[in-house]
A protein has these predicted regions:
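Short amphipathic alpha-helices in soluble, non-transmembrane regions
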Residues: 256, 365-373
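Midchain, well-structured core segments that form catalytic/ion-binding scaffolds
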Residues: 191, 199-363
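An extended, acidic, His-containing surface patch that forms the Zn2+-binding/catalytic region
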Residues: 92, 107-109, 215-216, 278-339, ...
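Acidic/His- and Gly-rich active-site-bordering loop/insert found
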Residues: 5-145, 167-171
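A common structural junction motif
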Residues: 118-119, 269-273, 370-378
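Acidic/histidine-rich catalytic neighborhood of metal-dependent amide-processing enzymes
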Residues: 142-144, 148-228
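Short glycine/serine- and small hydrophobic-enriched flexible loop segments
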Residues: 18-21, 159-166, 264-268, 473-476
């Protein structure tokens, strides 16, 4: 009986701790702040982006498929669209389609960098409802490849700077606009820009590139719009798995063919996901957004020491973005075997695309995969990859500037750090700055986000204006 009382007492104590922690896990008090409206020519911002969309700046890994004239057409258009930028800023053209604008500040102790890329991915025009390079505006929507990724922020940066310069504004410190024309093919354009910064000993205190956005229904139990600012991005590795054999006729196979061995390896990897690691970006997001969730989810996020296993199992079963925030993910994307149905291949291979949690490295991820497969006949080879980026600070003036610009533009949204699961050019800036933030200055629906790299990419015209407003607010603090 005493044991029963002890068990009941422990359970009551545990319940009390859980409920007390849940009750304390509420939105943090914030000082009330008003934001002055930002006035500028929003129609001109839309027209500028429309004209940029008409430039077919499609990048390919096979350079012979590219049209260099289209890239030069876009660059030649910039002085016309942004004349004040060309009056006050100097442009340095760097190899591999790198464009670096310099806007001198009143002082030169530190610098801010606003990034974007002006190349776009290929299109399948027959699957589009509107032509992807004509810049058609219909019912308040601009259609075209690059409207979201990322000519909207390219235009946002330059339109904001053009407006501020016309108003006689000069930043307190230097500002650079760093644009790449090879981001979509992982080209060296951004790397060349970073090397330029290193060679000229530029003290970079703030970098802003594409990344999160203002979105809804992305966090359990939260109904308000969430403005997600990436403070790190996952690493990436394309891993090749291969198995060799003597080959032969399919009529007399051995127990396991190369394809069978690969299939077994694939199943083992998919059935044994990487361990959950709640690193700083995810932990800060849970702490920020979790406080605004429903009671049940607040109880979970306030007591991950107790409910972490439940969250882990839910994420493993459902997959998706929340799962990707907490572990290294593996997606098998390619497989190759025999060229004939009745021939056992002398070799077979498959490739997985891995996105590495900040707790992992390419080396540790390969070791985990090797251990899960447990078959020396399966050879692993890293085709290409990069480790996760450093994690940027959030308790600093640089973060405050970005967060303030977001809050002023999308008033009522919940501004939160997060871990970016895609790759961007900003990953190259780790060696030159501890304050690299990934935010695409747009409010997007789930349907709109699905058009990025897909068919029918488009943007609402009012969103174009808000992108410019964000950069005006941000540059005004630099």
């Amino acid at each position: 009986m005493i044991v029963l009382y002890i068990i009941l007492a422990v359970l009551v104590l545990l319940l009390a701790v859980v409920l007390l922690r849940t009750a304390a896990f509420h939105p943090k008090a914030e000082a009330f702040r008003t934001y002055a409206p930002v006035e500028f020519d929003r129609e001109a911002a839309v027209t500028n982006l429309q004209r940029l969309i008409r430039c077919r700046t499609v990048s390919y890994t096979d350079a012979s498929k590219e049209d260099p004239a289209e890239f030069e057409k876009l660059i030649a258009l910039l002085p016309e669209l942004y004349p004040h930028v060309y009056e006050k800023c100097t442009l340095t053209r760097l190899p591999d389609r790198g464009l670096l604008f310099y806007w001198a500040g009143k002082a030169h102790d530190e610098a801010s960098v606003m990034m974007a890329h002006f190349d776009v991915v290929p299109v399948e025009e027959e699957n589009w409802k509107k032509p992807p390079f004509e810049g058609i505006i219909e019912d308040g929507v601009l259609w075209g490849r690059g409207t979201l990724d990322t000519k909207v922020t390219f235009n946002g940066v330059l339109t904001a700077a053009d407006h501020l310069i016309a108003q006689g504004f000069q930043p307190e410190q230097d500002i650079y606009f760093a644009f790449s024309g090879q981001e979509e093919i992982n080209g060296p354009g951004a790397v060349n820009i970073v090397h330029w910064f290193q060679e000229h000993n530029i003290n970079i205190q703030l970098v802003v590139d594409e990344g999160g956005a203002v979105v809804e229904d992305v966090f359990p139990g939260v109904k308000q719009p969430c403005a997600l600012i990436g403070i790190a991005e996952k690493g990436m590795m394309n891993l090749e798995y291969s198995v060799s054999s003597a080959g032969g006729h399919a009529s007399a196979p051995k127990p396991h063919t190369p394809v069978g061995a690969l299939a077994d390896a694939c199943c083992k990897v998919e059935n044994h996901p990487f361990t959950m690691h709640i690193t700083a970006p995810a932990a800060k997001m849970f702490d920020t957004l979790g406080r605004h969730s429903t009671f049940l989810y607040r109880m979970i996020f306030a007591n991950l020491w107790l409910f972490g296993g439940i969250l882990d199992n839910l994420c493993k079963k459902q997959g998706g973005e929340l799962n990707a925030l907490m572990r290294t993910t593996v997606a098998f994307t390619q497989m190759q075997g025999s060229k004939a149905s009745n021939v056992i291949p002398p070799s077979a291979s498959m490739v997985s695309n891995m996105r590495l949690n900040p707790a992992d490295t390419m080396e540790s991820a390969m070791e985990y995969i090797r251990g899960v497969i447990g078959n020396d006949a399966v050879t692993l080879r890293c085709v290409e990859g990069m480790n996760p980026s450093p994690i940027s600070e959030t308790d600093c003036p640089a973060w405050d500037k970005v967060a303030s610009a977001v809050a002023g533009t999308w008033q009522g949204s919940l501004v939160s750090p997060y871990l970016m699961v895609q790759c961007s050019d900003s990953r190259h800036y780790g060696p030159v700055s501890n304050h690299v933030y990934r935010f695409s200055a747009m409010d997007l629906t789930a349907e709109e986000r699905s058009t990025i790299h897909g068919n029918n990419e488009r943007i609402r015209t009012e969103v174009i204006g808000r992108a410019v407003e964000f950069y005006i607010r941000l540059m005004s603090q630099c």
